Amino acid sequence: MDTAAELEAIRRLKYAYFRTLDLKQFDDLGALLTEDVTASYEDGKTVLEGRDAIVTWLSAVLGDTGMVTEHHGHHPEITFTSDSTADGTWYLQDRVIVPAADLEIAGTAFYADRYRLTDEGWRIAHTGYTRVFEEHRTHSTLAVRSFRSRFDAPG
């Protein structure tokens, strides 16, 4: 096993997870998951099993184009548990902005992932996070002079 190449493949997998999440490309996000993937979001309040269930839930919770999300994964700690499995811990910094609700949520968390090497490459077999903190802010009082996103109507 070329450990450096496999580490890079897993890092790119998680980066793609965050990118497809923020761009609301849920079908593409689903392709990053194993079919039997499990997830534990919101400090274990939401536990899901299976690719379809996870993609459906993420789409329902984050798919509104009036909501913009920003997810950053930092400091990956990846440990190979075999030639075809690995565990990973990521430090998450995220933000959710909902201008119509005058709401901004910001926080940090630690993701705990399991990865499996499949015929298609590395895939996420489990993902979930535990919050370090989460704060809710009134978006309009943050001295924001203007706000626009890629999801706004042209014009």
Where are the regions that the model predicts?
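Short, low-complexity N-terminal intrinsically disordered segments enriched in polar/charged residues
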Residues: 1-23, 27-31, 35
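A structural signal for alpha-helical segments
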Residues: 5, 46-49, 103
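Low-complexity, compositionally biased segments
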Residues: 9, 25, 30-31, 46, ...
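A solvent-exposed, acidic/Ser-Thr-rich amphipathic alpha-helical stretch
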Residues: 26-92
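A beta-strand edge to alpha-helix "cap/lid" segment located at domain peripheries
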Residues: 62-155
